[in-house]
Design a protein with these regions (language model features):
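FMN-binding flavodoxin-like domain, especially the glycine-rich phosphate-binding loop
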Residues: 3, 13-16, 23-35, 47-179, ...
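Surface-exposed charge patches
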Residues: 23, 43, 98-99, 199, ...
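A short glycine-rich, hydrophobically flanked beta-strand micro-motif that places a catalytic Asp/Glu
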Residues: 32-37, 211-213
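Short acidic active-site motifs
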Residues: 39-41
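A mid-sequence, solvent-exposed acidic-amphipathic segment
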Residues: 165-191, 198-202
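Iron-sulfur cluster-binding cysteine motifs and their immediate structural context
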Residues: 191-214, 220, 224-242
Length: 300
């Protein structure tokens, strides 16, 4: 049996969980390939029997991840599992992803989600879930990977009763994120010496080689281009949107985490009194770049 994990990770949290799951699979079956979605040739997936898919939850499955899944060829009679990371409310991801994978003929044999820290310019810093993933989370991911191998083997052997029910879809979302309106200050931009925003645009809609540069005002949004720009050439007015997001964090996200904590699904590592309600991420990290991409993630 051959296994592969494909993943998207913006801040590195999902990557950590993916590699931990891979470790569990490796211990159970001796091998497991792992590939970020940016380096994936979807045609290669036909050679695998067990396929894992990991991603953060951005109000559900991120658009560019969904777009990639839709390009996967038919994979009937093969097994899949999926997992996500999130900062409070990840409940939409798994029902959506399971259905995307099932449309490709895959049998989904397991799902999992983890609370992780959040690097979002409008979210308070420190944040409610900071400190995750920790060693306990990583061990859980390793155990999850090992479990997926065991279940896959047994399902292939005929124990189809082990296949979990398809998680129900939630009602249409009423929550929407503020639309990220940005502009490029060409006087500050270092292109062609720097092309970080273009290289790491999730939707591949930035093209600085054109004259004038192709730089859409609105997008997914992931905010990554603004976070990684070394000179602050990507400009955005976060003030009013940060107030809205802080309000949601104080109410909706806090309530969701309190409920999860009471049910034993969330371990609080950052006390509420330590949360930076007055310092959204963009104020906590005032200088540019606000986030530095680790060297080994530069091609992801």
């Amino acid at each position: 049996m051959k296994c592969i994990i494909i993943y998207f990770s913006q801040s590195g949290n999902t990557k950590k969980m993916a590699y931990a799951a891979r470790e569990g699979i490796h211990k159970a079956m001796g091998q497991c390939h792992i590939v970020p979605i940016t380096r994936l040739d979807v045609r290669d997936l036909v050679g695998y029997d067990l396929i894992g898919v990991g991603s953060p939850c951005w109000l559900g499955v991120p658009f560019h991840v969904e777009r990639l899944i839709n390009t996967i060829p038919a994979l009937s009679d093969k097994h899949a599992f999926t997992f996500c990371t999130h900062g409070a409310k990840g409940e939409r991801f798994l029902p959506e992803m399971v259905r995307l994978l099932m449309k490709k003929g895959l049998t989904v044999i397991g799902t999992r989600d983890w609370y992780c820290s959040v690097n979002h310019p409008l979210i308070p810093k420190p944040y409610l879930t900071d400190g995750h993933p920790d060693e306990i989370d990583l061990q859980e991911a390793e155990n999850f990977g090992r479990e997926m191998v065991e279940i896959s083997r047994r399902v292939y052997a005929g124990e189809t009763n082990l296949i979990p029910e398809v998680p129900p879809m939630l009602p249409p979302r009423t929550l929407s994120r503020p639309q990220f309106k940005k502009k490029l200050n060409t006087k500050k931009c270092l292109y062609p010496e720097c092309s970080l925003c273009m290289d790491h645009c999730r939707l591949k809609i930035i093209d600085l080689s054109q004259s004038p540069p192709v730089f859409p005002e609105e997008c997914q949004p992931c905010y990554f281009c603004e976070l990684i720009c070394p000179t602050g050439a990507i400009e955005a007015d976060y003030e009013s949107d940060a107030e809205l997001e802080t309000g949601r964090a104080k109410t909706m996200f806090t309530e969701a985490l309190e409920k999860a904590e009471a049910e034993g699904r969330f371990r609080r590592l950052t006390p509420v009194e330590k949360v930076g309600w007055d310092t959204p991420f963009y104020k906590f990290f005032r200088t540019h770049p606000r986030y530095v991409i680790p060297e080994d993630d530069r091609d992801e």
